[in-house]
Amino acid sequence: MQRFGFLRCRVGLVALAICFTCDAAPAWAQPYPNRPITLIVPLPPGGSNDIMARAVADKLSASLGQQVVVENRAAGGSGTVGTRQTAKSAADGYTLLLGYTSTLATGPSMHRDVGYDPRKDFAPIGLIAAAPSLLLLHPDLKIRSVSELIAMMKSADPPFQVGVPGIGTVNHLASVLFAHQAGVKVQQMPYKGSNALITDLAGGHVKVGFNPIPVSRAALESKLIVALAATSLRRSTALPDVPTVAESGLPGFDAVLSYGLLAPAGTPRPIIDTLNKDLRAALATEEVKQRLLQEGAEPMPTTPEEHAAVIDREETKWSTLIHSVGLKAE
């Protein structure tokens, strides 16, 4: 009887433990996601970054069964401030970042202390798209090739002025890379945004500039400016008749903006995989493809590992250029 009572006691304890386990399981094993997700865009509404985020947010909301809410945190620093804030968020999959080249590759070298390490503080989920910029001219120059422009720049005294939308942006560094590879001296003319540059370029106040496709399209269609070349290795689907800088005399020239989704480092891999799967599905839809192409961007579905490799490659490339030409951190 004593032995039977001991066994009954053990069975009771096991049953009690199972009950506690069942009660506790939902606290840590609830399916993801079970509440809305915040997607941080570290820049103001209306720009290319905002459009990229919203292009995929609706599709992700539908496939995940929870709302993906785009939140703009335009706190300055070319997006580095909002990026730093996201890096410090909980690694639970409920706060994501729209990361791009200027915050993940050029920002850490162009700003003295961004407060985050792109390689260590984030878990890449996948790329969304890549977008080239354009080498633009005022029509009065009557130049028809990159080689003609380089020849004019080499003979210019004082150095040729080149308009760029901001310091430390990919467009700014595209102009630096162009001068570096062409062996010419230029004077960068920074503007407070792409629209201000287009206004001055169309008015002839500056004769050459690097600018994104979407902001430049209306002035191009009105023939107020001329697209001499695209900054990607391959021609842009949005402007297939515009040659690339690489095919026009500077082999290997490549300066594009990459956009992608990231989570804070330490986010569980199953969550990363779920988000990557649904992101790739969103990029495969015709609706998202067309929306990205309107921005001059090419959809770029990748694995998390491929996304990480792009960040690493771009950071190495741009930091090497920044240091080799002696650009100073702000």
Give the positions of each predicted feature:
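Bacterial N-terminal signal peptides that target proteins for export
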Residues: 1-13
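N-terminal (or domain-start) structured segment
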Residues: 28-120, 159-161, 167, 183-210, ...
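A ligand-binding cleft/hinge motif common to bilobed small-molecule-binding domains
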Residues: 103-113, 176-181, 208-242
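Hinge/capping helix and adjacent helix->loop/strand transition within the periplasmic-binding protein
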Residues: 88-94, 109-196, 245, 256-291
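Bacterial N-terminal signal peptides
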Residues: 10-23
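An extracytoplasmic/periplasmic, membrane-proximal ligand-sensing/linker region
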Residues: 34-36, 180-181, 247, 269-330
